[in-house]
From Swiss-Prot:
It comes from Bacillus subtilis. Disulfide bonds: none annotated. SMART domains: HTH_CRP. GO terms for molecular function: DNA binding. It holds the Pfam family RepL. This is Replication and maintenance protein. InterPro entries: HTH_CRP (IPR012318), Plasmid_replication_RepL (IPR008813), WH-like_DNA-bd_sf (IPR036388), WH_DNA-bd_sf (IPR036390). Keywords: DNA replication, Plasmid. SUPFAM superfamilies: Winged helix' DNA-binding domain. GO terms for biological process: DNA replication; plasmid maintenance; regulation of DNA-templated transcription.
Length: 146
């Protein structure tokens, strides 16, 4: 993983070369580490989500977490496909997805769901801002379709 640094200017300073006695003016720059490209799991939100769900519903949540595309936090699957893949009933999938929607954990359109980037995402702060905008617009787009 490549770390990223932001350069911060802290002014200038005069130094004296011990050998020559020459006065040298230098700029003081510091590097501040910023978020790199990694997967963030926000534990508080993850735990609160798991508290809302139990049993077979947890199987569905794990399936979503395992199959979401971290490039855009989406998963393309119908409720029937999720039910078949997890060995749960269609009604359990529908109920679980409704709970996740009401908890602002996912947003859905026909055949596609998007996971809230405050819960899980891969990328830096800029990517999170972008995904949060997409997450906000996801529901709006879904409402325009309906």
């Amino acid at each position: 993983m490549k770390e990223r640094y932001g350069t911060v200017y802290k002014g200038s300073q005069r130094l004296i070369d011990e050998e020559s006695g020459e006065v040298i003016e230098v700029d003081k720059l510091y590097r501040k580490q910023t978020s790199g490209n990694f997967v963030k799991a926000y534990i508080v939100q993850l735990i609160s989500m798991l508290d809302m769900i139990g049993g077979k519903k947890l199987k569905i949540v794990n399936y979503i977490l395992d199959n979401v595309h971290l490039s855009n936090n989406t998963m393309i699957a119908t409720t029937r496909e999720i039910a078949k893949a997890t060995g749960t009933s269609l009604q359990t999938v529908i109920t679980t997805l409704k709970i996740l929607e009401e908890g602002n954990i996912i947003k859905r359109k026909t055949g596609v769901l998007m996971l809230n980037p405050e819960l899980l995402m891969r990328g830096d702060d800029q990517k999170q801002k972008y995904l949060l905008l997409e997450f906000g617009n996801f529901e709006q787009e879904a409402n325009e379709i309906d």
